[in-house]
């Protein structure tokens, strides 16, 4: 009786499996063709979440059914092989009780394994059906809500998430814009501060000429000058020299910018480099422009001379640096060697800049090689 039942099941599964295989495969292929023709694979991610889930479920159900039928077929084949073994053993030794007992145990173990596999498949199928029912319940309209749109709740959740992400992106863009504006304001303030020094250029030149002629403000150790008067004169000279050095820093910055733009042609890179030097200048390094210009004159004198030949303003800037540097050096050298003003200003970066420029340019800014 058991053998007849197994034979009937085997015939039923073998005949129906082919139909299920063909139907499931056709279902999957038609689903893929439908998506390709009417929706497009590029529009999948623009679908709502429940639509994507239904699409995946539609394609995966026939595949799962094919796998289930395949496993059932394997189980039936295994049972048939066991049946064949039992028949063979029965024919070989029909009177052996030990062989019959062993076959019964083997069949019992195999039946338990088959039952476990069938139970697992039934549980998996039940879970798949439950997921499908939950998805349908989610897509179905609520009778108590009165909402005409069955996907209103899901659409509202998706809309709130999108608005949250948009708000975060707008906050980041606003913070970045504020940072850029703050950097631009800081840079504009530095440029305005440097430009304001140009207003004093003519007055400083006249003051230096007057001081060089009179020499009365130089704190020479004269008899009859008390320490307070000597300190006042040194302070006055230091203030004049400080204004002159600020003006020279502005001129050196302009000359350095003209030279770098002509040599490299990268205005953005030049602006970044000048901004770095400006930050160092306002941080306390008052000689940073002189030191950078000395390096360019020493290492790229040919390029600077070519720039001076083709640009009148470059020659004027070089001439201004040479004339003011010589006046400052003359004032400082007139001080007593032990005076603080001379100790601070003598043999500094400005001295090195004047020496480097004087080796390649005349007092009017004309290159020596072109004179």
Swiss-Prot record:
Keywords for this protein: Biomineralization, Lipid-binding, Magnetosome, Membrane, Transmembrane, Transmembrane helix
Q: What happens when the gene is disrupted?
A: Deletion of 4 consecutive genes (mamY, mamX, mamZ, ftsZm) leads to cells with an intermediate magnetic response where magnetosomes have short chains of nearly regularly shaped, cubo-octahedral crystals flanked by small particles with poorly defined morphologies.
Compartments where located: Magnetosome membrane
Cytoplasmic-side segments: 1-18, 73-371
What's any one GO cellular component for it?
magnetosome membrane
Which residues does the entry place in the Lumenal compartment?
Answer: 40-51
UniProt entry tagged with the keyword Membrane: yes
Membrane topology value: Multi-pass membrane protein
The main location class comes to: membrane
UniProt-recorded Gene Ontology molecular function terms: lipid binding
Q: What induces it?
A: Expressed in exponential phase, peaks about 18 hours. Protein is associated with magnetosomes as they start to develop, rises to a maximum quickly (at protein level). First gene in the 4 gene mamXY operon.
Segments passing through the bilayer: 19-39, 52-72
Job of this protein: May be involved in constriction of the cell inner membrane to form mature magnetosomes. Binds cardiolipin and liposomes. May function with MamX, MamZ amd Mms6 in biomineralization.
State the family named in the UniProt similarity comment for this chain.
Answer: Belongs to the magnetosome MamY family.
Enumerate the NCBIfam families for this protein: MamY
Subunit relationships? Probably interacts with MamX and MamZ proteins.
Q: Reproduce the miscellaneous comment text.
A: This bacteria makes up to 60 cubo-octahedral magnetosomes of about 45 nm in diameter which contain membrane-bound crystals of magnetite (Fe(3)O(4)).
Q: Which protein, by its recorded name, is this?
A: Liposome tubulation protein MamY
């Amino acid at each position: 009786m058991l053998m007849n039942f197994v034979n009937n099941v085997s015939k039923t599964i073998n005949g129906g499996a082919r139909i299920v295989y063909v139907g499931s495969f056709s279902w999957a292929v038609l689903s893929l063709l439908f998506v390709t023709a009417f929706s497009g694979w590029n529009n999948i991610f623009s679908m709502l979440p429940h639509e994507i889930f239904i699409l995946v479920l539609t394609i995966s159900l026939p595949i799962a059914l094919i796998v289930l039928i395949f496993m059932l077929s394997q189980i039936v084949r295994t049972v048939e092989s066991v049946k064949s073994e039992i028949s063979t053993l029965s024919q070989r030794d029909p009177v052996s009780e030990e062989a019959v007992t062993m076959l019964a145990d083997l069949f019992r173990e195999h039946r338990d394994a088959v039952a476990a596999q069938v139970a697992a498949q039934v549980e998996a199928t039940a879970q798949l059906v439950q997921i499908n029912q939950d998805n349908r319940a989610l897509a179905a309209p609520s009778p108590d809500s009165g909402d005409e749109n069955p996907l209103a709740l899901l659409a509202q959740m998706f809309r709130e998430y999108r608005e949250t992400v948009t708000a975060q992106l707008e906050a980041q863009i606003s913070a970045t814009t504020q940072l850029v504006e703050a950097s631009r304001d800081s840079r504009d303030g530095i440029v305005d501060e440097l430009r304001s020094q140009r207003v004093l250029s003519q007055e400083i030149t006249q003051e230096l000429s007057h001081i060089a002629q009179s020499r009365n403000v130089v704190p020479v150790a004269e008899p009859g000058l008390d320490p307070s008067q000597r300190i006042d004169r040194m302070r006055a000279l230091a203030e004049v020299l400080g204004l002159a050095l600020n003006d020279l820093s502005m001129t050196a910055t302009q000359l350095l910018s003209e030279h770098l733009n002509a040599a490299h042609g990268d205005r953005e890179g030049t602006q970044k480099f000048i901004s770095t030097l400006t930050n160092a200048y306002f941080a306390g390094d008052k000689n940073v422009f002189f030191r950078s210009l000395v390096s360019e004159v020493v290492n790229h004198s040919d390029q600077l001379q070519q720039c001076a030949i083709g640009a009148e303003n470059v020659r004027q800037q070089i001439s201004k640096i040479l004339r003011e540097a010589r006046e400052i050096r003359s004032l400082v050298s007139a001080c007593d060697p032990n005076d603080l003003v001379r100790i601070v200003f003598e043999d500094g970066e400005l001295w090195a800049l004047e020496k480097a420029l004087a080796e390649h340019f005349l007092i009017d800014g004309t290159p020596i090689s072109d004179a």
